[in-house]
Amino acid sequence: AASDVYKRQAQDVKTLREMTNVGMMDCKKALQATDGDMDAAVDWLREKGLAKAAKKADRVAAEGVAYAAVVNGIGVVIEVNSETDFAAKTDAFMDLVKNLATVVATENPADVDALKACKYPGSNLTVTEIMQEKVMSIGENMQIRRFARFADNTSVAYVHAGGTHGVLVNLAVEGGIDATEIGKNVAMQIAAMSPKYWDKSQVPQADVDKELAVQVALMDNDPKMASKPAAVKEKIAAGKMAAFYKESCLLQQEFVRSDLYKGDVAGYIADAAKKLGGSVKFVDAVRFQTGEGIEKKQEDFAAEVAAQMNMGK
């Protein structure tokens, strides 16, 4: 229906505005110019000089918990979704999540289906059967969404704000030092800053080219810049690319705990390890944000209240 299309378009304009802090009319123009492609619309606004680099809209809607733990030296991060925030905060739900993390660590299942077929700790039942029981007792649907596991090197787990983020950091540690605090601080950085890449050497060439094209278009569309020599533009673009790496790559990001170290994350890791008398190398990490990428059905708030009042009759 036309009204549904209009609602969807209005929602897209709202989302783009939240991502870019650009006015509604310009957001509408950007979406019209790019046939509703959100990423292309962000680039269109940037090329016109209307928007700075926008973070992807965190379309976080599903409730649940992102949990990380180290079990017998094996790092695990897992996301389990529920229908309401209330259920996710119950002891029964958290016990389930912790036990699932233990199963991932000990059984090394290949995927979510394999995890569901595993035996549940302290029971003869499978994970699926236990979850069916929990659904009955808690009174709402629950889903294991995803998990990741590190068996090598040293893993450090961090859970932020009661399970909104679960981060697992994997480090290569030498010199017999305890790198737990280093790992926790790096994990907190990842939770807070959501880097797109770990190191600038890992940024795909296509992404580098795309960012460079945006910067060049931005200068070409600026009357003050358009007439400047190509060499000057190249120098400015190089400076913009350095800023791009600093914003989007973990090891090049400014370390948020400036009370501990002033400089980038790579510098913090090296400095902290040296103070402990050893060396630490960042290997890998996984960041789960609860409900990331899951779109929840948009309900009209007034209709929702009315529906609840009718239910109470």
Model-derived features with residue positions:
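N-terminal assembly/interaction segments in proteins that build large macromolecular machines
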Residues: 7-313
